[in-house]
UniProtKB/Swiss-Prot annotation:
Name of the featured protein: Protein GrpE
HAMAP family the UniProt entry points to: GrpE
A single BP term in Gene Ontology: protein folding
Compositionally biased intervals (Low complexity): 22-34
Keyword field: Chaperone, Cytoplasm, Stress response
Pfam families per record: GrpE
Function: Participates actively in the response to hyperosmotic and heat shock by preventing the aggregation of stress-denatured proteins, in association with DnaK and GrpE. It is the nucleotide exchange factor for DnaK and may function as a thermosensor. Unfolded proteins bind initially to DnaJ; upon interaction with the DnaJ-bound protein, DnaK hydrolyzes its bound ATP, resulting in the formation of a stable complex. GrpE releases ADP from DnaK; ATP binding to DnaK triggers the release of the substrate protein, thus completing the reaction cycle.
Gene Ontology CC annotations of this record: cytoplasm
Record organism: Chlorobium luteolum (strain DSM 273 / BCRC 81028 / 2530)
Length: 198
């Protein structure tokens, strides 16, 4: 008996068909596994939202911290600039006070009016005018002299350079002023140098 010759083409078609059916079955299984339920999709999205909120919170905290650091830095630089300006102003005013002291010494040594020669009178008037203008300018800048004579010694405002016997004054009372002290606003620009009674 002769066997019927197998058709190679039919074998191939059968194999292809079996393979295709197998792939279709696997794809269907994968597809059914890949299809999410609405609940699982919502749960996944909620997890993502929560993770984003946490990340957003971290970024927000970092931003607030950096903003606070910058604000503190800015305020510190402003304070430093104000202090530097204040120191520069104080130094200029202190230097100017030595000029005021010199003018006061000149005026303190002016002879009595009847002893002043006529030729010297305009110069003395000029020095007096200079003193008035200096005092007016200092006052416009907030600089004022510290009261001293007749006051009790206050080390915050006065510097005692000597003590003397003075029958008409109580102890620690200022009886003479050697150098005028000045305030700039409420700060001591220069202490008054004074002589106090024992």
């Amino acid at each position: 008996m002769m066997k019927k010759a197998e058709d190679p083409l039919q074998d191939r078609e059968g194999t292809i068909q079996e393979h295709t059916e197998g792939q279709a079955g696997t794809a269907a299984a994968d597809q059914s596994a890949a299809v999410e339920t609405p609940e699982s999709r919502i749960a996944g999205l909620e997890r993502e939202v929560q993770a984003e909120k946490e990340q957003n919170g971290k970024f927000r905290d970092e931003l607030l911290r950096r903003a606070a650091e910058f604000e503190n830095f800015r305020k510190q630089k402003e304070r430093e600039a104000v202090m530097a300006s204040q120191r520069a102003t104080d130094n200029v005013l202190r230097d100017l006070l030595t000029l005021v002291d010199d003018v006061e010494r000149v005026l303190a040594n002016v002879p009595e009016p009847e002893e002043i020669p006529a030729a010297a009178k305009p110069y003395i008037d000029g020095v007096e005018l200079l003193k008035k203008n200096l005092d007016r300018w200092l006052e416009s800048k907030g600089v004022k002299p510290i009261e001293a004579i007749g006051m009790k010694l206050d080390v915050d405002f006065h510097e005692a350079i000597s003590q003397i016997e003075h029958p008409d004054a109580e102890p620690e009372t200022i009886v003479e002023q050697y150098q005028t002290g000045y305030l700039l606003g409420d700060r001591v620009l220069r202490h008054a140098k004074v002589i106090v009674a024992r």
